[in-house]
Amino acid sequence: MKVFGNPNQKKQELKNLIKNLTLDERYLFKKKDFRKEILKNIDKNMTLLDVGKSMRDYFDEIVCVEKKTLDINIFENYPDFQFDLSEDIEIEKTELNEKFDVIIYLAVLEHVYNPFVAIKNLRKMLKNNGIIYGYVPFLYHYHAPEDLYFQDYYRFSKDGLAYLFREFHNLKLYPVRGRLSSSMHILFGSIWKRTFEKYNLNPILDGFFSKDKILNKQVGLTL
């Protein structure tokens, strides 16, 4: 048998990446609006970038020294920076280099055609000891619009996130839907959200059906 490279060493490195992340399974059974949770952790002295203006209605509630938006597309009232995160450019030569204390990207990364380059770019925009808050799907339906104004490329497992964010430290995952909630959301979509999720019934049901399977993830990371 011929061995090329050092596959055994790489296998161990990958295992260590996964073992070193934190998965807070208890979060699954605590129905919370994670946008509100993020809002509580933003200090008025921070600089902040919201990719895709993904804080939605909470964006206007953010109080900090400076808050900016970034998007590949142009909408009526944003972004401040039009930027293709998948484009490998020299961030170091732009005003975005190490500019932000906090970067938020919620339900954005699945729409980025090269998430590896995107995360590298976001890391360069982040100050030392800054934090990234994100939300990514694992089991979720295809949701690009018919006109493909934005596209839908990827889904992310725990192992995939560990590798994607391998240059960060203090990687923490918080599941927001379990086995039952994810299945029902795929099958019934907005009906499920307007009923069970609106009245916070899904954490109770997930408690019975989802303890061994964590599906959708919210992810918070610190550089």
What are these regions (language model features)?
Residues 33-37, 102, 107, 213-222:
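N-terminal capping/interface segment
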Residues 113-123, 131-223:
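S-adenosyl-L-methionine-dependent methyltransferase catalytic module, highlighting the catalytic core
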Residues 37-145, 150, 158-162:
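Conserved SAM-binding loop
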Residues 10-16, 43, 66, 178, ...:
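Alpha-helix initiation/capping motif
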Residues 1-43:
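Class I SAM-dependent methyltransferase Rossmann-like catalytic core
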Residues 7-9, 25, 44-46, 72, ...:
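Short linear motifs in intrinsically disordered/low-complexity regions
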Residues 27-35, 48, 52-55, 154-158, ...:
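A structural signal for well-ordered alpha-helical scaffolds and beta->alpha junctions
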